[in-house]
Curated annotation (Swiss-Prot):
Pfam families noted in UniProt: Beta_elim_lyase
UniProtKB keywords: Lyase, Pyridoxal phosphate, Tryptophan catabolism
Cofactors that this protein relies on: pyridoxal 5'-phosphate
NCBIfam families: PRK13238.1, tnaA_trp_ase
Family the UniProt entry places it in: Belongs to the beta-eliminating lyase family.
One of the record's GO molecular function terms: tryptophanase activity
Modified-residue entries (N6-(pyridoxal phosphate)lysine), positions: K270
Enzyme class, first EC level, given as a word: lyase
Protein name per UniProt: Tryptophanase
Catalytic reactions of this protein: L-tryptophan + H2O = indole + pyruvate + NH4(+)
Enzyme Commission number: 4.1.99.1
Pathway: Amino-acid degradation; L-tryptophan degradation via pyruvate pathway; indole and pyruvate from L-tryptophan: step 1/1
InterPro entries named among the record's database cross-references: ArAA_b-elim_lyase/Thr_aldolase, Beta-eliminating_lyase, PyrdxlP-dep_Trfase, PyrdxlP-dep_Trfase_major, PyrdxlP-dep_Trfase_small, TNase, Tryptophanase_CS
Length: 473
């Protein structure tokens, strides 16, 4: 298939789901009833759902077939061993705990690593700080509910939508080491390498950067956990952009990347393509004590550690999905679909973050400059987009970032972005064209979009369940 300008999707569509078309009047009433929060809309009222790529996409025929091999034994399931063997083969990690999704892994490993640091290094719980290139929202939430500060040490260009760079998801290595020394190495219970970096726009992290982070962490004996939701997309970007790895396969790059962490926590609902599932894995015997403690917590919080809240068929499907998500032609198609959407939006004057792996990120601050950060311009844009076209998207900005738990003040946000997250193998190029056209209509009326204020504000992860109202001028 060489020398073609346009290549179609590398799959055939066998099952379809009808969707409901609605009127503008209907949608205005629906979003008002949902407290001006797209998370609270009923899915049947959404025409194109770009809220998340987490568990919302299609699966492969091999994944579906694998479900029928499920061993539903409570303990020692054959399906667990199939999953653990896949993890060992792909990532090179010896110890595997399945979880119901990524946050299931987070609620287990975070308190265990804090406790370990306290016992072995004398961590002061009043001074502890965890570090990341950028914490995913639930990782930040679990860090904070364990009374630990979550600090992001990203590069200067990460959130500058006017800058193009190969690896905008990288750690700022100088800031990382400064943050370790400022907190005191003993007070840093873990470092999280997030690949790709979702909050920065699905931007990749280079292998050289992952290696350098790990070297710094080892210097201070700090464990590194790889947030692995989009591990395959990150490997694809490394292959395409990092000179030393252009002739490596996705599988080879993945195995090399995971040398530079001690454990991985994964929402398998992204690159592993399953509707439900997660992983918590550790590399080798040096983390056997952590693995053992995490298994104990798993029994209490997720289920017996050889099923972790998943049925046997789901573990079989995940074992296959880890491989299917690494297919070269699949990844090329997926990344190109995002790039097509970003290029189309920018062609009509809608400024976006550089195309990343799983979503287009619109710079809402530039599209709605009249709305200040504390009135959540990206969330206001999400509501307007739904009213105009029935498209559901999600804010990645001040609303998501939340308040400082100690002071109650709003965290300063580096950018106000609206994420248009593309579910896997679900929407076609025609859908992308419709989204671009919808933004043309939104842009034409942008000056009339109103800011928002809370009518109900949860204390943790407020963006999921908050209720808001428009602010009248």
């Amino acid at each position: 298939m060489d020398n073609f300008k346009h290549l179609p999707e590398p799959f055939r569509i066998r099952v379809i789901e009808p969707v409901k078309r609605t009127t503008r009047e209907y949608r205005e009433e629906a979003i008002l009833k949902a407290g001006m929060n797209p998370f609270l809309l009923d899915s049947e009222d959404v025409f194109i759902d770009l809220l998340t790529d987490s568990g919302t996409g299609a699966i492969t025929q091999d994944m579906q077939a694998a479900m029928f091999r499920g061993d539903e034994a409570y303990s020692g399931s054959r399906s667990y061993h199939a999953l653990a063997n896949a993890v060992k083969d792909i990532f090179g990690y010896e110890f595997t705990i399945p979880t119901h999704q990524g946050r299931g892994a987070e609620q287990i490993y975070i308190p265990v690593l804090i406790k370990k640091r306290e016992i072995e290094k004398g961590l002061d719980r009043s001074k502890m700080v965890a570090l990341s290139n950028y914490f995913f929202d639930t990782t930040q939430g679990h860090t904070q509910i364990n009374c630990c500060v979550a600090k992001n040490v990203y590069t200067e260009e990460a959130f500058d939508t006017g800058v193009k760079a190969d690896f905008k998801g990288n750690f700022d290595l100088e800031k990382l080491e400064e943050a370790i020394l400022e907190a005191g190495p003993a007070n840093v219970p873990y470092i999280v390498s997030t690949i790709t970096c979702n909050s920065a726009g699905g931007q990749p992290v280079s292998l050289a950067n992952l290696k350098a982070v790990y070297e710094i962490a080892k210097r201070y004996d700090i464990p590194v956990i790889m947030d692995s939701a989009r591990f395959a997309e990150n490997a694809y970007f490394i292959q395409q952009r990092e000179k030393d790895y252009q002739n490596w396969s996705i599988e080879e790059i993945t195995r090399e990347s995971y040398k530079y962490a001690d454990g991985l926590a994964m929402s398998a609902k992204k690159d592993a393509m399953v509707q439900m599932g997660g992983l918590l894995c550790f590399k080798d015997e040096s983390f056997l004590d952590v693995y053992t403690e995490c298994r104990t917590l798993c029994v209490v919080q997720e289920g017996f550690p050889t099923y972790g809240g998943l049925e046997g068929g789901a573990m079989e499907r995940l074992a296959v999905g880890l491989y299917d998500g690494m297919r070269q032609d699949w990844l090329a198609y997926r990344i190109n679909q995002v790039e097509y959407l970003v290029n189309g939006l920018e062609s009509i004057g809608v400024v976006c973050q550089q195309a990343g792996g799983h979503a287009a990120f619109v710079d809402a601050g530039k599209l709605l400059p009249h709305i200040p950060a504390d009135q959540f311009p990206a969330h206001a844009l999400a509501c307007e987009l739904y009213k105009v076209a029935g498209i559901r998207a999600v804010e990645i900005g001040s609303l998501l970032l939340g308040r400082d738990p100690a002071t109650g003040k709003q965290h300063p946000c580096p950018a106000e972005l609206l994420r248009l997250t593309i579910p896997r193998a679900t929407y076609t190029q025609t859908h992308m064209d419709f989204i671009i056209e919808a933004f043309g209509k939104v842009k034409a009326n942008a000056a009339n979009v109103k800011g928002l204020e809370f009518t109900y504000e949860p204390q943790v992860l407020r963006h999921f369940t908050a209720r808001l109202k428009e602010i009248d001028a």
